[in-house]
């Protein structure tokens, strides 16, 4: 479900991989408690795996419908925002807490403006612009 369909699938895919990688890298680089690092590594890894399985421009296996993928986006956003408070590291890992909240809000924002009605025959992508 999106509010407006501004963002094409290929750009959403780029954002997915960027978020997944940045969650892992920032969590490991920043350090902190096991719980604080685990949130970034686990959510980041799941984002990457779901992205690779999704039927969209940068999907690898392309077995998961993009509309189903959207549910994972909303779940990831919620987990990123609430996990510092639920797992109790918001007072000790303030940098990671802020990063997770910002990342969660960004994931939510991207999800709300994505066109989840992806059709690979009609979708513009950078590679099609080169060959056209």
Descriptions of predicted regions:
Residues 16-37:
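Membrane-helix boundary elements
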Residues 1-10, 117-132:
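Intrinsic N-terminal pre-sequences and regulatory tails
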Residues 95-115:
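Alpha-helical membrane-associated segments of multi-pass integral membrane proteins
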Residues 69-84:
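Hydrophobic alpha-helical membrane segments
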Residues 82-99:
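Membrane-helix boundary connector in multi-pass membrane proteins
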Residues 3-15, 64-71:
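Short, amphipathic, aromatic/basic-enriched membrane-interface segments that mark the entry/exit
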Residues 2, 39-69, 109, 113-122:
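A low-complexity, Ser/Thr/Gly/Pro-enriched, surface-exposed linker/loop concept
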């Amino acid at each position: 479900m999106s509010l407006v369909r501004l963002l094409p699938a290929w750009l959403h895919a780029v954002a997915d991989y960027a978020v997944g990688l940045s969650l892992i890298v920032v969590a490991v680089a920043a350090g902190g408690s096991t719980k604080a690092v685990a949130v970034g590594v686990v959510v980041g890894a799941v984002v990457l795996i779901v992205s690779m399985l999704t039927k969209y421009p940068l999907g690898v296996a392309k077995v998961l419908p993009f509309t189903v993928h959207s549910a994972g986006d909303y779940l990831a956003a919620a987990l990123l925002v609430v996990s510092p408070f639920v797992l109790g590291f918001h007072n000790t890992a303030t940098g990671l807490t802020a990063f997770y909240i910002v990342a969660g809000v960004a994931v939510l924002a991207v999800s709300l403006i994505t066109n989840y009605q992806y059709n690979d025959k009609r979708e513009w992508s950078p590679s099609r612009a080169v060959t056209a």
